[in-house]
Structures are given as C-alpha cells and as structure tokens.
Amino acid sequence: MAAVSNESQNPVDPGSSKLQFAPFSSALNVGFWHELTQKKLNEYRLDETPKVIKGYYYNGDPSGFPARLTLEYSAFDINASIPARCCPAFGTLYNTNTFETFKSCDKKSLLEKEANEIWESIKSGAALENPMLLNRFLLLTFADLKKYHFYYWFCYPALCFPDGIHVIQKPVCLGDRFSLNQIQALQKAYDELCQTEGVTAFPYFLIKYHDNSVVVSPLKKWDGFFQDQGGKVTVGVYDPCNLSHYPGWPLRNFLILASHKWGNILQSIEVLCFRDRTMQGVRDITHSIIFEIKLPQGAFGPDCPKAVGWEKNQKGGMGPRVVNLSECMDPKRLAESSVDLNLKLMCWRLVPTLDLEKIVSAKCLLLGAGTLGCSVARTLMGWGVRKITFVDNARISYSNPVRQPLYEFEDCLSGGKPKALAAAERLQKIFPGVNSEGYNMSIPMPGHPVNFSEVTMAQARKDVATLEELIDAHDVVFLLMDTRESRWLPAVIAASKRKLVINAALGFDTFVVMRHGLKKPKQQETGNACFSTAPGPSDLLGSSLFSNIPGYKLGCYFCNDVVAPGDSTRDRTLDQQCTVSRPGLAMIAGALAVELMVSVLQHPEGGYAVASSSDDRMNEPPTSLGLVPHQIRGFLSRFDNVLPVSLAFDKCTACSPKVLDQYEREGFNFLAKVFNSSHSFLEDLTGLTLLHQETQAAEIWDMSDDETV
C-alpha cells in the first residue's frame, strides 16, 4: 500500500561529531491515489497549478519502522481531521499533465521555492506563532490513468548549516537521563499543553525541568521562559524517528530557526526528541532521546540557505518512484473509473459544459432486445448509463448472434435463452457496474386479441400493469421492436406519464430515429389553455416551414398515419414478416437513437426543446453537442440523412388527447377494447373514420366537377 524508504535504516557511524538526521520516507495510501484520480478527472483536468495538500507523521511507531510522512485519501481536504496523536504537515502538490513534463520539471527551482517560504516564515517570526510552517513538503506527480501507473517524487525541504551541527553530548535514551518522576511529569505536561492548544500532538515546545517537575510551553512564549535556568535551554521536538542515536527530519528546520533567532545569545541547546509509543496498552516515552548540540552563530546572511530534501527512490538513487495500482485496486472500481475516463476527458477541453450526471443517471428502458436493442444498449454503456432494462418475449435463434452483439452461439442451444434475460446478463459481464435487468414478457398489441379465455385476459392485464410500472420507473423509453403495432401501447403509456420516448425503426436501407413529442404536465394543460397539445392558428405561425416547433407540439411515431395500427404480420410471407435490412443499418440507427437522447438531455428544456431541422445545420447549435432534431431519416443507398419535423396530429391513434383521455379514465378496459377490436375502433374514436369519409366525399365532388367540364 505505502511506498516506504529504507534509507534511514542505515545511518552513518554514531561516533561522528556532526549531527545526522534520519530522513522522512513517503507513505502514500491507495486511497490517496484514488482521490487524486477523481480530482484529476473531475476537477483539475488540465490545470497544473500547485494545490495545497496535507499529510501527517507519527512519533509512536514500533522499533524498526522508518520515519514516515503519510498521505491518505483526505490529503486534499486541508480541514479534514487526522488520526489522533499525529502531527500534521502541509505541502504542495504539482500534478503534471504529461510524463514528459514530469521528467523535465525544474526540481531545483521547486525546492528553492519551498525553501524560501520556510526561510521567510523564520525571518518574519511566523514560524514561532505557527511551528507547522517548518515542516513543509512538496509532491511532484504524474498519473497515467489508462494504466493506473502513478509516478511521484517527494521532497522534504530542509535548510542547511554551512558547516553542519556539532554534537556536544551524544544522544542517550530519556530513561537514562530522567528519573521516573521527571518522565511522568514530562508526559503530563505535554498532554496538558496539547489540551490547552486544542490538538493531540504538538510539533515543537520549550522545556524546563527540575528534580521532580517539568514545565513545557509553546515556542512563542520564549521570552522569559528560561530566566531561572541559568542559561540552559531545552527544546522538545515531536520526533517520528525510532533510531537510538539520530533525530528525525523535523529537527533540521527548527535548528535553523533557533540559530537565526537566538544564536547570538546561546552557545548550545539541549534537544529532547519526544517519542510516544504505546505497547500492549502501556504508554512509554522512555525511548525518547536527549542530547546537546553547539548552536552555530552568525551562520546566515539575508538570503535563504542552501536546501536539500528530494527523496531517494527504491534503488537508493536520486529519482522518482512509481506505483502500479492496476492489479491491487478493486477490478470493479477500476472498470468504473475506466468507463468514465473518456467521458470525463470530453469535459477537459472539447465540451466543458457537458453535464455527464444527466446522462449517467438516466434510467433507460429498452423495449426490444434484438438487433436495435443490442446496439442501443452498447452505446448507452459507452455513455456511462448505469441503469438499463430490457423487455422482450423472444428467444435467441441461430441467426441472431452475428447481427446482435450481446449474444453468442451457446445462447442459441436448447431452444435459445430468453433475449431480455440474456442481454441483461451479458451487460453485467461486460461491465459489472451496470444495473441491468431483463423481463421476458409480451406487449399486448392492437389487432391481436387477448380475449380467448380468462387466462389470456389475466395475462394481458398483468403484462400491461408490468409495462406501466416499468415506464413509470424509467426516464427514457426506447421503442426498438419489430412491428409497428407493438410500439402503440408503450407510446400511449409513455405519453400519459410524460416520459421521453426515443423511437428507432428500420427498412431495408432506410431508417427513422425520432423523439416523440413530450406532452406538457397535466396541471398546465388543464389550468391554462395555452398549453393545449392541439395546435391553434397562432401555434402554426411559422410552423409551415417546420421551424421553431417546441417539443410539446412534436408528433409521435403514429402521427403521420391515417389508419390505426393492426396485425401487420397476417398474410405475410417470411421476408415480409422478418426485418430484412442491410447489416450495418441497425448499428447506425441504434447509435443515432442514443446520441439523440444525449442531445435532448443536454438541452436546458430537455424533451420540450425546439426541434432542429435540416435548415438549421448552418445555424448556431442549441446545445454544446449540436442540434436537437425531431427526426433523423437515413438513406443508406445515398449515404444521406435528413432532419424533418412534424407536428402532433390531433387525430393520432397514440398521442391525441382523445386516446390519452380514454386511457387515463378507463385504463385496461379501454386497452382491451383496442386489443380485441379491429382498427376501426381507434379510427372511430380519434375521428379518422370521419376524415376518411370527408376525403372520399371530396374526391366524389372533384370527379363530378371533371365530368361536368
């Protein structure tokens, strides 16, 4: 999990007269890299400006552990709490966009910049008020989010004395210098200081001790604190190091502070490296070390001293480290992050205003799990949609797998698996993060009687109720069935429930993809006549050119029909019963159906968006993704598409006010009449029968006029 250096395990000879320090080792939790990934994708994007982050270090590790500076998932929230009895350290993150930038970055300049900030805090006295300013770090990173390889290089800036620091008294354990009473008094005094300051760990503090008493105080209370000590000065440092002869890295910058502030009045200073370990429930600070050093005088000018601090890599050389998380991260979370990667990259530069949440959170119901259904499902997954539900009553046949990419040869055996169930199962195998369900059920249709028996009527009632529940539970309904009449019932239910409907249908080398007009909310229709779905004279102003037609006045799949839907498979040959089309057509139409949905969702008015037509191709697009058409009609023989717009028909057999009113008032009783009757029932209800009669009468009058002439 954490990358830890072992270089502090091999210190120099303790007999050296100059003080040596055990450097920090970086310890980056997997949660840190996961959070960096999310920040990079969703927030930073191409931004390379420095970011403030927070880590912590601990002075209670068991013997043998290196001095670690830890960064967790909460490192990006500087106000987040850290574990108890740990000391915070603030740093700067430099996250680069490319590996080349990471390699060529001026490390010397970055170190000097951080060192100058520490030096300025020392000169200004800010470090006395806030000692945490002495423990800064910087982190240079590059995240390869395709492979989940993370390159990083830590730096712990430490200012240096020109001639080093000479040791007067070598480090010894606190238990060898202090009595038991003094140790207990020190522990109590330190706890009281932390409680007074409202923290659980304090990085630097002043100490004065007598035979049986110890007093500690913050650095800012230096003046007058040591007046009764006869020139003896002792300071405490919260020390993450475990070595018995060497202090940890946090002492370095403090000694620079001490030399700059008090070097002219002090010749030496006693240092207590405070280490606070709990073993088997017993707290122990006796392994802390205490020693005396000679404090250099006049060692600095106005300029920042030389600084060091770049961490060595695992091989012990000066270079970055790399961590490969592609294998240790949860495969499902990896899949989710990877699925979202390309989508979020769109927002970086190409489409900054793209609202991915609207797309990802859309719950999609696919009525039909055949050639169109498979293509639509795969494209929806490409857009990151997490909720996909299939409805189909067919089983997978041997002709299906080559045209329907969610199925395999094994799915055809033993009579074939139910398409809806197999499609839902396959989506979860492709991407475990998708919530896919399948319903193996029939959709009752006009002209297909269900009144053969009580059993068939009960089954039809159950199927209608299930379909109503499914449409109610989803945001977008895709009509992808083979026959025209099978689209009628879901078109009626979706229109009544004000759901967005995307329809796709195929010919041999032609297709139509369209969005149904989205009716205004019922309270607006009843409360204000201007929201009537039937277009009045003022509504049609300019509509003859099929421009500026709002979404609630757009027609549905049945609005261009002058006959009611019926049994289209009766008395048809095999080639007329099956959908015979060019193999690539379904993938084109399926992709366009999903892209139309996405464009509608990105429009501020959603399904009520004004329809774009072919005439709008040269105009300013209404969304960041371009046009929002009503229909897309494609002609593969000419490799051409057109974008027609049509108004809602007040005599439509699916979305007209008369049909919706009858459905909402009578429910299944009305639907049963449609299923069990001929097409004349819907035509009589909507006025199509009268329209036919008027048309025939007009033709008779025309013929009479011709004969007279």
From Swiss-Prot:
Family label: Belongs to the ATG7 family.
Pfam family, one: ThiF
Keywords, ordered alphabetically: Autophagy, Biological rhythms, Cytoplasm, Protein transport, Transport, Ubl conjugation pathway
UniProt note: domains: The C-terminal part of the protein is essential for the dimerization and interaction with ATG3 and ATG12.
GO cellular component, one term: cytoplasm
Main localisation: cytoplasm
Subunit-level organization: Homodimer. Interacts with ATG3 and ATG12. The complex, composed of ATG3 and ATG7, plays a role in the conjugation of ATG12 to ATG5.
The protein's name in its UniProt record: Ubiquitin-like modifier-activating enzyme ATG7
Single GO term (MF): Atg12 activating enzyme activity
Localization: Cytoplasm; Preautophagosomal structure
Active site as annotated: C578 (glycyl thioester intermediate)
Record-linked InterPro entries: Atg7, Atg7_N, Atg7_N_1, Atg7_N_2, ThiF/MoeB/HesA, ThiF_NAD_FAD-bd, Ubiquitin-activating_enz
GO biological process terms held by the UniProt record: autophagosome assembly; autophagy; cellular response to nitrogen starvation; mitophagy; piecemeal microautophagy of the nucleus; protein modification by small protein conjugation; protein transport; regulation of circadian rhythm
Function: E1-like activating enzyme involved in the 2 ubiquitin-like systems required for cytoplasm to vacuole transport (Cvt) and autophagy. Activates ATG12 for its conjugation with ATG5 as well as the ATG8 family proteins for their conjugation with phosphatidylethanolamine. Both systems are needed for the ATG8 association to Cvt vesicles and autophagosomes membranes. Required for autophagic death induced by caspase-8 inhibition. Facilitates LC3-I lipidation with phosphatidylethanolamine to form LC3-II which is found on autophagosomal membranes.
